[in-house]
């Protein structure tokens, strides 16, 4: 399990751990997504992401996590949504990122032997549904109506550019969108 000695977990007002992640695409067509091996279960694939640090903005946290876990840099695009995992008490800000640079060696490849691999979106959904269904939801949401603009124009499915709030379990008095 990955735990850094200087790591500080941050929580929102309702006690959910604040997380950020990116769906990293090879191009703006958003047809191939990068997944990384899990630190806990190296034979399983996940979307790169992790906890936000104190005073860190969600977009900055997402870019940092992708750099550490996947060894890529890119152009940060739109906020796809804020996904809630009731079981683990996580709220994850999920962004779209178009990869512009791929590092040969990166922090998690060197320290824990993490791997990365490109998947067609449909294949990634199938792989993620087995052990990380919440991560599969990110890609399913993407397919349901977010055009591949990567933040270059307004997203029709999100009025006024508000983030869609998605729950992994029935909502418990949480608003359907967060402004």
UniProtKB/Swiss-Prot annotation:
It holds the Pfam family NUDIX. The gene is Nudt4. Binds 3 Mg(2+) or Mn(2+) ions per subunit. The keyword Heme does not apply. It is found in: Cytoplasm. Mg(2+) 1 binds at residues 49, 69. GO terms for molecular function: diphosphoinositol-polyphosphate diphosphatase activity; inositol-3,5-bisdiphosphate-2,3,4,6-tetrakisphosphate 5-diphosphatase activity; inositol-5-diphosphate-1,2,3,4,6-pentakisphosphate diphosphatase activity; inositol-5-diphosphate-1,3,4,6-tetrakisphosphate diphosphatase activity; metal ion binding; snoRNA binding. Its main location: cytoplasm. Substrate binds at residues 9, 17-19, 38-40, 88-90, 114, 132. Mg(2+) 3 binds at residue 65. Mg(2+) 2 binds at residue 65. It catalyses: diphospho-myo-inositol polyphosphate + H2O = myo-inositol polyphosphate + phosphate; 5-diphospho-1D-myo-inositol 1,2,3,4,6-pentakisphosphate + H2O = 1D-myo-inositol hexakisphosphate + phosphate + H(+); 3,5-bis(diphospho)-1D-myo-inositol 1,2,4,6-tetrakisphosphate + H2O = 3-diphospho-1D-myo-inositol 1,2,4,5,6-pentakisphosphate + phosphate + 2 H(+); 5-diphospho-1D-myo-inositol 1,3,4,6-tetrakisphosphate + H2O = 1D-myo-inositol 1,3,4,5,6-pentakisphosphate + phosphate + H(+). PROSITE patterns: NUDIX (PS51462), NUDIX_BOX (PS00893). Its EC number is 3.6.1.52, 3.6.1.61. Belongs to the Nudix hydrolase family. DIPP subfamily. This is Diphosphoinositol polyphosphate phosphohydrolase 2.
């Amino acid at each position: 399990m990955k735990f850094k000695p200087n790591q500080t977990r941050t929580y929102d007002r309702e006690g959910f751990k604040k997380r950020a992640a990116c769906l990293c695409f090879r191009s703006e067509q958003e047809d191939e997504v990068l997944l990384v091996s899990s630190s806990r279960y190296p034979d399983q694939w996940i979307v790169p992401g992790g906890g936000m640090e104190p005073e860190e903005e969600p977009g900055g946290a997402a870019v940092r996590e992708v750099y550490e876990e996947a060894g890529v840099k890119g152009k940060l695009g739109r906020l796809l949504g804020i996904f809630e995992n009731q079981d683990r008490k996580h709220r994850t800000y999920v962004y779209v990122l178009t990869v512009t640079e791929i590092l040969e060696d990166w922090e998690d490849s060197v320290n824990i032997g993490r791997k990365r691999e490109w998947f067609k979106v449909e294949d990634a959904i199938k792989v993620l549904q087995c052990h990380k269904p919440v991560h599969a939801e990110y890609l399913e949401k993407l397919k349901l109506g977010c055009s591949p603009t990567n933040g270059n124009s307004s997203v029709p499915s999100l009025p006024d550019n508000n983030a869609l709030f998605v729950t992994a379990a029935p909502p418990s008095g949480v608003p359907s969108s967060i402004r």
